[in-house]
Amino acid sequence: MEHYPFKLHSEFEPQGDQPEAIQKIVNGVNEGKRHQTLLGATGTGKTFTMSNVIKQVGKPTLIIAHNKTLAGQLYSEFKEFFPENRVEYFVSYYDYYQPEAYVPSTDTFIEKDASINDEIDQLRHSATSALFERDDVIVIASVSCIYGLGNPEEYRDLVVSIRAGMEMDRSELLKKLVDVQYTRNDIDFRRGTFRVRGDVVEIFPASREEMCIRVEFFGDEIDRIREVNYLTGEVLRERDHFAIFPASHFVTREEKMKSAIQRIENELEERLAELNAENKLLEAQRLEQRTNYDLEMMREMGFCSGIENYSVHLTLRPMGSTPYTLLDYFGDDWLVMIDESHVTLPQIRGMYNGDRARKQVLVDHGFRLPSALDNRPLKFEEFEEKTKQLVYVSATPGPFELEHTDEMVQQIIRPTGLLDPKIEVRPTENQIDDLLGEIQDRIDRNERVLVTTLTKKMSEDLTIYLKEAGIKVNYLHSEIKTLERIEIIRDLRMGTYDVIVGINLLREGIDIPEVSLVVILDADKEGFLRSQRSLVQTIGRAARNSRGEVIMYGDKITDSMRYALDETERRRTIQEAYNEKHNITPTTINKKIHDVISATVENDETNEQQQTEVPKKMTKKEREKTIANIEKEMKQAAKDLDFEKATELRDMLFELKAEG
């Protein structure tokens, strides 16, 4: 394994309370602290702080986010901060995934159906191979990193290592490639395949995007190794050595495969005896037929559809033991950072039970062997055992972080000097007329307003009332498709609307600098949407504007409201003192309005991108043209590593195709 230091590229130096936060976390890691929490207010540069910690600590780092969009955003940011180091992306490679399931009440079996994103699969392979090649690796992952993966030792041991000048004939290399699940394809050359032309073998590694390896033989010796652009054939550079990692994470040696097949046959025999004893003849016949088909595929091809369900046998683990995951691909000394930990940790905790419930039904009705239950995500206790040092990052840490952290590392100061918003609590009497007056004030100043309610009916009624009063308003709710949701937020920023009304305005993408007023109706109704954390997060929506204010309507002050008021006031006091001491004037964040709604097409004459609005109703020809344009832009966004935009464009495609 090669050693490289982390090199952070940024035109900014840590400022405000960032230097102190960085030093505290670095000291904690060096002292061997297991749990640390960075309590960072919205907009204080938590990602930059995390980057500085990684640079100073110098350990391979896993950063876990709670969804693909957030992971993609972090990936783009860390790639910018560490262009000379290996920043990798590891999320579920399914664009669409329907797990196999059985509904006993209707006797319905749902086959597994999935669409695999080839680029994300390549990035997953890039991540695992990087962890074995270097120690300056940052992996940005979603919660899918706790799902089962192949044995890392087997994955590493089966690497095909080639050197210029080494003795190896062509047929020996081809056999080794087939053993690690590469397939020969002389026509359709793509990732995970190789092609043969005389004494030249070209291999397309599973972890690469555009580069393939050309191996030239002279008799029984490798004469030269070169990196080549697979499309143009251009030679990129000479290589003395190259390591070809397996094309699948579930790769198994031939002798192990034989042992695994024997174990599966033994388990099948035992399970059939159980089912027959219970007079479950249909289930027994179904299980025997399905399992024998899979076994035949394994003998002939070395793999089968759904091979992950036999992972406990393929890795020769005892039944019920902890599965291998991405966490096992890290060495002994590494760091975990959990972003938005108040959301991510509960997700990690809940994965096992949901997966278990679905698979148990499949096992009970003869669709799978009991060992399929061992192809699962980690239990939370197993996750804790596998991780040694964790840094939780959140503006509102949850109970787990509070319980396990001695002292919070706080980051309250914003580099822009922005303060937490002023909060005012007002009675509910005449609240709508009062709200109307406040909205009108903001419209006069060309500012925007967010209003959060507790119920769908309240949102709808309020939206109708405001429209009748002449306000440009729209309503955000869970039934609105991704395409429309992004369009509504963009239209708010552009001034098409002045107000957005919604129930839960905490989702990503609602940080809008133009918003100077956040209104919380029914603030005194305790519950999930009016809890301490929800209120603090909602208040944060007004923290991107120098005139940010929050109005809570309620007839009493609940414990959650009191906490949110006190916490915001505490932060404001710290921020004001810092600004006064350093003579800083708060300035509203200037955030570019990205065009994620329009498909862009390339103008041949000007070679510039122009916007093409997606019409509400389109002819079939127009729809096909729009779909082609969006697909083109989506692929370009993925190529530019702008996964957030690529994901949004993908969702637009799904919706346009569904409407067609």
Curated annotation (Swiss-Prot):
Residues 431-593 form the Helicase C-terminal domain. GO terms for molecular function: ATP binding; ATP hydrolysis activity; DNA binding; excinuclease ABC activity. The UvrABC repair system catalyzes the recognition and processing of DNA lesions. A damage recognition complex composed of 2 UvrA and 2 UvrB subunits scans DNA for abnormalities. Upon binding of the UvrA(2)B(2) complex to a putative damaged site, the DNA wraps around one UvrB monomer. DNA wrap is dependent on ATP binding by UvrB and probably causes local melting of the DNA helix, facilitating insertion of UvrB beta-hairpin between the DNA strands. Then UvrB probes one DNA strand for the presence of a lesion. ATP binds at residues 40-47. SMART domains: DEXDc, HELICc. GO terms for cellular component: cytoplasm; excinuclease repair complex. It is found in: Cytoplasm. NCBIfam families: PRK05298.1, uvrb. Forms a heterotetramer with UvrA during the search for lesions. Interacts with UvrC in an incision complex. This is UvrABC system protein B. A motif (Beta-hairpin) lies at residues 93-116. It holds the Pfam family UvrB. One of its GO terms (biological process) is nucleotide-excision repair. Disulfide bonds: none annotated. Its main location: cytoplasm. Residues 603-622 are annotated as: Disordered. The beta-hairpin motif is involved in DNA binding.
